[in-house]
């Protein structure tokens, strides 16, 4: 490299070095998770505020970590700053070394700890995917096995046939699919695809999901919530040149329209559940689906409420939908 070129690049190199030097130390990764269920009725529609706060406090370190790696990986996606990618990889590698979340899922009053691990895998696998092109072989050797162990631990939870494969199954599938994609693990990719397909197969002709219709006043909310990981999984499939949106004659479109119509007027949900629905503003899946829908204008009003952020879906969803989930093609 010539001296003039080196001098020209010096400010950029110094800025990146300074940013990486400023990367804060990650918190220690804990092996066990203790989360607390906070619904008081069988339908899962009535919240106990005290239990909800206890759960929020108990899981705050996990939520902060997820938000931090999402933010750092967003910085890389937005600016191509290698220091942001390296900080993300440093944090992921530290928790991999700690064996974070591979210990006991402590059952307090329900399976909330298992659900929390699923959401955390969603977050860390999506963050890793976003910075994958900056990971060197040594970093991949640290991080890949950890994510794969988490994914297989999450899948093992669903081996019990008594567990209801509702929105939690779809959210679990997202982390497994993202891990399969990021680590080039075909078995995990196929397992994630199976979770996606289960969600698509659950969609009725009227766009409803039977298990979410049983959620009383929160049925509309949980249709929106269940749709989010399905849309994100379809987006990950696009990175491999696959169109999962077309599955079962575009069944996902029926669900998306049912949710967006319900957010404007919940009368249909009120009638079919027998419960007045809590108000809903559609969540960040609209940032992607409005670009894929045959009638994207239906989702413009929801899009206008953005930008949308969700660490469990990867971070800044508006950024990811606009610029792509990854900067370079997957290896």
Swiss-Prot record:
Effect of residue 221 to F: Increases activity and specificity toward poly-ManA
Assigned keywords, A-Z: Carbohydrate metabolism, Cell outer membrane, Lipoprotein, Lyase, Membrane, Palmitate, Polysaccharide degradation, Signal
Substitution effect: residue 222 to F: Less than 0.5% of wild-type activity against all substrates
GO cellular component: cell outer membrane; periplasmic space
Record has NADP as a keyword: no
Protein localization: Cell outer membrane
Outcome after substituting residue 312 to L: Increases activity and specificity toward poly-GlcA
Variant or mutagenesis effect after changing residue 171 to A: Displays nearly eliminated HA activity, while increasing poly-ManA and poly-GlcA activity by at least 35%
Lipidation (N-palmitoyl cysteine): 23
Biological processes per GO annotation: polysaccharide catabolic process
Activity control mechanisms: Is inhibited by mono- and divalent cations as well as L-ascorbic acid 6-hexadecanoate.
Residues spanning the membrane: none
Known outcome of mutating residue 23 to F: Impairs subcellular location since the protein mutant is completely retained in the cytosol. Loss of extracellular lyase activity in mutant cells
Gene3D superfamilies, per the entry: Chondroitin AC/alginate lyase
Pfam family, one: Alginate_lyase
Protein name (record): Polysaccharide lyase
Organism of origin: Stenotrophomonas maltophilia (strain K279a)
């Amino acid at each position: 490299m010539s001296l003039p070129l080196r001098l020209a690049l010096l400010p950029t190199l110094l800025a990146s070095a300074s940013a990486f030097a400023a990367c804060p130390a990650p918190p220690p990764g804990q092996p066990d998770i203790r989360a607390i269920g906070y619904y008081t009725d069988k339908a899962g529609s009535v919240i106990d505020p005290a239990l909800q706060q206890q759960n929020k406090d108990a899981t705050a370190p996990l939520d902060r970590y997820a938000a931090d790696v999402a933010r750092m990986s967003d910085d890389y996606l937005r600016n191509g700053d290698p220091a942001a990618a390296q900080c993300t990889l440093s944090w992921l590698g530290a928790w991999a070394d700690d064996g974070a979340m591979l210990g006991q899922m402590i059952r307090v009053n329900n399976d909330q700890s298992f659900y929390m691990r699923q959401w955390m895998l969603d977050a860390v696998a999506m963050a890793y995917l976003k910075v994958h092109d900056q990971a060197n072989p040594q970093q991949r050797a640290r991080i890949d096995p950890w994510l794969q162990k988490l994914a297989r631990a999450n899948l093992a939870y669903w081996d019990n046939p008594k567990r209801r494969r509702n929105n939690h199954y779809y959210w679990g599938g997202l982390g497994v699919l993202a891990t399969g994609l990021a680590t080039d693990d075909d078995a995990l990719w196929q397992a994630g695809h199976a979770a996606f397909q289960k969600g698509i197969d659950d969609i009725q002709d009227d766009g409803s999901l039977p298990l979410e219709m049983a959620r009383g006043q929160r049925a509309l909310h949980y249709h929106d919530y269940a749709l989010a990981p399905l849309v994100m999984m379809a987006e990950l499939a696009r990175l491999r040149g696959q169109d999962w949106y077309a599955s079962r004659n575009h069944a996902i479109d029926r669900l998306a329209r049912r949710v967006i119509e319900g957010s404007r007027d919940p009368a249909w949900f009120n009638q079919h559940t027998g419960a007045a629905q809590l108000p809903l503003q559609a969540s960040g899946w609209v940032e992607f689906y409005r670009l894929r829908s045959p009638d994207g204008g239906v989702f413009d009003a929801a899009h206008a409420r953005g930008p949308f952020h969700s660490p469990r879906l990867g971070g800044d969803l508006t950024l990811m939908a606009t610029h792509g989930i990854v900067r370079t093609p997957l290896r």
